[in-house]
């Protein structure tokens, strides 16, 4: 695995094997029996899958030190965002060689919410 040390690679492979064994221990339910029996088996199977997913997350967090939540992307305030069509205007196959964009206030574009 490119850019990673060998020790963390073996640890990652070991964790993947453990998680694979967990998922293999819960095969899909059999499609036999009455509708109610099939529904109950699927419900129990989904509950076990949910537990396996939670256990897998805990294993990854404890063994690899993965942060529990992904890093949030910091976005600028909506007031500072603008649409700029000078780079990729038009449909596919056309070049965006149009006239320059005219900046309009958002209130003139969206209106005030009252009908005239």
Swiss-Prot record:
The modification Phosphoserine is found at residues 5, 8, 92, 99. Pfam families: REV. Coiled coil: none annotated. Belongs to the HIV-1 REV protein family. Escorts unspliced or incompletely spliced viral pre-mRNAs (late transcripts) out of the nucleus of infected cells. These pre-mRNAs carry a recognition sequence called Rev responsive element (RRE) located in the env gene, that is not present in fully spliced viral mRNAs (early transcripts). This function is essential since most viral proteins are translated from unspliced or partially spliced pre-mRNAs which cannot exit the nucleus by the pathway used by fully processed cellular mRNAs. Rev itself is translated from a fully spliced mRNA that readily exits the nucleus. Homomultimer; when bound to the RRE. Multimeric assembly is essential for activity and may involve XPO1. Binds to human KPNB1, XPO1, TNPO1, RANBP5 and IPO7. Interacts with the viral Integrase. Interacts with human KHDRBS1. Interacts with human NAP1; this interaction decreases Rev multimerization and stimulates its activity. Interacts with human DEAD-box helicases DDX3 and DDX24; these interactions may serve for viral RNA export to the cytoplasm and packaging, respectively. This is Protein Rev.
């Amino acid at each position: 695995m490119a850019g990673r040390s060998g020790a963390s690679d073996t640890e990652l492979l070991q964790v993947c094997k453990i998680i694979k064994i967990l998922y293999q221990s819960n095969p899909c339910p059999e499609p036999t029996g009455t509708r109610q029996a099939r529904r109950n088996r699927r419900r129990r199977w989904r509950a076990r899958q949910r537990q396996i997913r939670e256990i897998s997350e805990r294993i990854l967090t404890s063994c690899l030190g993965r942060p529990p939540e992904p890093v949030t992307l910091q976005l600028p305030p909506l007031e500072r965002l603008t649409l700029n069509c000078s780079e990729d205007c038009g449909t596919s196959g056309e070049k965006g060689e149009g006239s320059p964009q005219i900046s309009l206030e958002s209130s003139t574009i969206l209106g005030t919410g009252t009908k005239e």
